[in-house]
Amino acid sequence: MIPVKGFAGANVAVLGLGRSGLATARALRAGGAEALCWDDNPAAREAAEGEGFTIRDLRKQGVRDDTACLIVSPGIPHLYPAPNPVVAAALEAGVPVDNDIGLFFRSFAGPEWDGFDTLPRVVAVTGSNGKSTTSALIHHILSEAGRPVQLAGNIGRGVLDIEPGEEGSVVVLELSSYQTDLARALTPDVAVFTNLSPDHLDRHGGMGGYFAAKRRLFAEGGPDRAVIGVDESEGLYLAGQMSEGPGDDRVIRVSVSRKLTGPGWQVFARKGYLSEYRKGRQAGSIDLRDIRGLPGAHNHQNACAAYAACRALGLSPKAIEAGMRSYPGLPHRSQIVAEAGGVTYVNDSKATNVDAALKALGAFKRIRWICGGLQKEGGIAALNGGLAEVLKAYVIGREAAGFALQLEVESEVCTTMDEAVARAMAEAEPGDTVLLAPAAASFDQYDNFERRGEDFMAEVQKRLDG
């Protein structure tokens, strides 16, 4: 646990008692603060009360002037589309609003660090797609290389649940736009921006607000090293803003769309080969084509970002390649779940938006595509530019018929996962790939994308076993 600093003897309100909220309450108590907790869910309140925390109905009693700070969980809106009433009341009263990420950055360093020869480092990863894979890959590479490393944030443990830093250790954080937007302190040693595509726009007031939330990771004091994907205009702009000149190697530019040139530090992948150039000279290369845990160009982008971050931490190209080759991949992200009768079955349930689905569609051949769900802002028309390898779409979700009508490829309205899997498997031939890449949210039929992916895998396995 990371005891929170700066609030000893003070009251701190905690709104939301899920994984991060309850961990925050514990860390506040460990730092000498009194956590005043609230969640609309009675079971969550009961769990907190069972650990001895004070329950205060912040909806009715508000955030009083005896409160030093309000800590908000990521799912609670603090500005758009409208601030939660408790947050609005705190802002009106002048009470600072923060989250567990801000508390982590103000509390992670300890007095014992004065005796370390090699200080602990923090790598923070943000972006629209690829955050989890990039974060997990960095963690895996470092672990395989023998570095003490912890994985936290949106993946792994709650950020305040991790152990204090030890000499030479690394913490890898996956951070969403909700987290970077609100955190009052953001000071990673290495910051990674994977890419940007429309997502969560209602929570940020539009695309500009969404980019601004991501960009804060690079603006709050600035990291020692910035790894920035430059395949979108926002990333290219951010890299330019961070750089002091063409040869400034504080910024490592990353691309999978083109060969990068110039005197700076670049990592790019072309035709399945990763290349690193620094000061105009090649410094490393990896053949990514046969790395099973990283299929497709989108995973090559993740590989480039992870490679750059690990190089910034001092690892050799050889050590990084060894880690990549043993990387098993993450569930629900281009996850090969079965191969039978010459047909490959892939679970990419995490492809919850158009951009992520397009990247999955570009990674495989002869695709029987299971898609559909709750469409996100911006629609799905852009999918039609990436359907060259799609033999047929099998559409699920409550809006399956409307979804199918927008696709310029042969489609069948299946509605449910069991029907879609049954139809795709019945029609699949050797050499085909049955791919779940929904391009939509899951909440019309499932609690989350994980449950959707698990349903797909269960339906596939049931039929293979039968």
Curated annotation (Swiss-Prot):
Its main location: cytoplasm. The keyword Cell cycle applies. The keyword Cell wall biogenesis/degradation applies. Keywords: ATP-binding, Cell cycle, Cell division, Cell shape, Cell wall biogenesis/degradation, Cytoplasm, Ligase, Nucleotide-binding, Peptidoglycan synthesis. Its EC number is 6.3.2.9. GO terms for cellular component: cytoplasm. Pathway: Cell wall biogenesis; peptidoglycan biosynthesis. InterPro entries: Mur-like_cat_sf (IPR036565), Mur_ligase_C (IPR004101), Mur_ligase_C_dom_sf (IPR036615), Mur_ligase_cen (IPR013221), MurD (IPR005762). It catalyses: UDP-N-acetyl-alpha-D-muramoyl-L-alanine + D-glutamate + ATP = UDP-N-acetyl-alpha-D-muramoyl-L-alanyl-D-glutamate + ADP + phosphate + H(+). Signal peptide: none annotated. One of its GO terms (biological process) is regulation of cell shape. ATP binds at G127, S128, N129, G130, K131, S132, T133. GO terms for molecular function: ATP binding; UDP-N-acetylmuramoylalanine-D-glutamate ligase activity. It is found in: Cytoplasm. Cell wall formation. Catalyzes the addition of glutamate to the nucleotide precursor UDP-N-acetylmuramoyl-L-alanine (UMA). Belongs to the MurCDEF family. PANTHER family: UDP-N-ACETYLMURAMOYLALANINE--D-GLUTAMATE LIGASE (PTHR43692:SF1). This is UDP-N-acetylmuramoylalanine--D-glutamate ligase. It comes from Ruegeria pomeroyi (strain ATCC 700808 / DSM 15171 / DSS-3).
